[in-house]
């Protein structure tokens, strides 16, 4: 499995400019400074993580069917990107194979580890044309590794994405978000503790601003490559107590990255639309 820490390029949809112009300008500035950021054309929204194919090997991507239930309304149906596999093939050329499947998966619901993938079990509900056992077997085949399922907290959100809950660190360790329902996180950890080494939790100070409290989950939605980590920031200068607390924890959890390569990016524009940096990329 290709994990975040061995990737070398970050892609964003050109739609980021239209939907989140401030965040787009931040990314353009980083690109102009030489950071490994690229933009692609042809998508209908900015949430590239959910519709673009998932890299499972150095020269292989899997293009799942993008048909989320939360976009099945007249208002949002036209925002569904159905040609993501073709976009990826244009970007990759003959460098990699893109495999199509009829399994419905949002890419934000796939957290890759060295030898497995973690998903919210909403994926079963999303694929009524598969039995649970057949779906599980096919996902295992496509990813080339074990697949672990954590429960869907449908009271917290309609998306059911694992990248808002947990991320893989390294050496079998996981990092969990500051989640509104601590019982839910404990339930997820109980399931995953048999397959991973250590469980770490992001924490937030009780003295933070009430207006920022609902966005504290977002720090888990960071972007990671082999050289850089980009953390969502809630304040423009990344100087609010939540941002500084999160940054210190990232520096602790990722000692292999120079501190100057762990970079906060003001992302409130995207967070207000219910997605973070990982969701956009």
Would you name each region that the model predicts?
Residues 1-281:
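The feature marks the mature, well-folded catalytic cores of soluble enzymes
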């Amino acid at each position: 499995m290709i994990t975040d820490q061995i990737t070398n390029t970050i892609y964003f949809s050109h739609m980021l400019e239209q939907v989140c112009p401030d965040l787009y300008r931040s990314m353009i500035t980083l690109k102009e400074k030489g950071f490994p950021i690229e933009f692609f054309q042809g998508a209908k929204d900015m949430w590239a993580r959910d519709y673009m194919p998932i890299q499972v090997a150095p020269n292989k991507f899997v293009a799942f069917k993008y048909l989320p239930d939360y976009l099945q309304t007249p208002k949002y149906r036209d925002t569904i990107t159905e040609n993501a596999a073709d976009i990826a093939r244009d970007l990759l050329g003959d460098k990699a194979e893109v495999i199509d499947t009829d399994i419905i998966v949002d890419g934000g619901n796939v957290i890759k580890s060295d030898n497995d993938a973690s998903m919210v079990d909403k994926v079963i509900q999303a694929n009524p044309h598969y039995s649970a056992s057949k779906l599980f077997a096919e996902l295992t085949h496509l990813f080339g590794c074990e697949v672990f399922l954590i429960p869907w907290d449908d009271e917290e959100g309609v998306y059911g994405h694992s990248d808002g809950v947990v991320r893989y660190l390294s050496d079998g360790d996981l990092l969990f978000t500051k989640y509104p329902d601590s019982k839910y996180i404990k339930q997820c950890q109980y399931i995953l503790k048999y397959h991973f080494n250590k469980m770490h939790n992001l924490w937030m100070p009780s003295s933070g601003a009430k207006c920022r409290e609902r966005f504290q989950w977002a720090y888990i939605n960071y972007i990671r490559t082999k050289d850089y980590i980009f953390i969502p920031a809630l304040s423009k200068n990344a100087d609010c107590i939540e941002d500084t607390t999160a940054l210190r924890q990232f520096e602790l959890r990722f000692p292999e990255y120079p501190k100057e390569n762990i970079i906060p990016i003001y992302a409130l524009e995207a967070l207000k639309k219910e997605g973070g940096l990982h969701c956009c990329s």
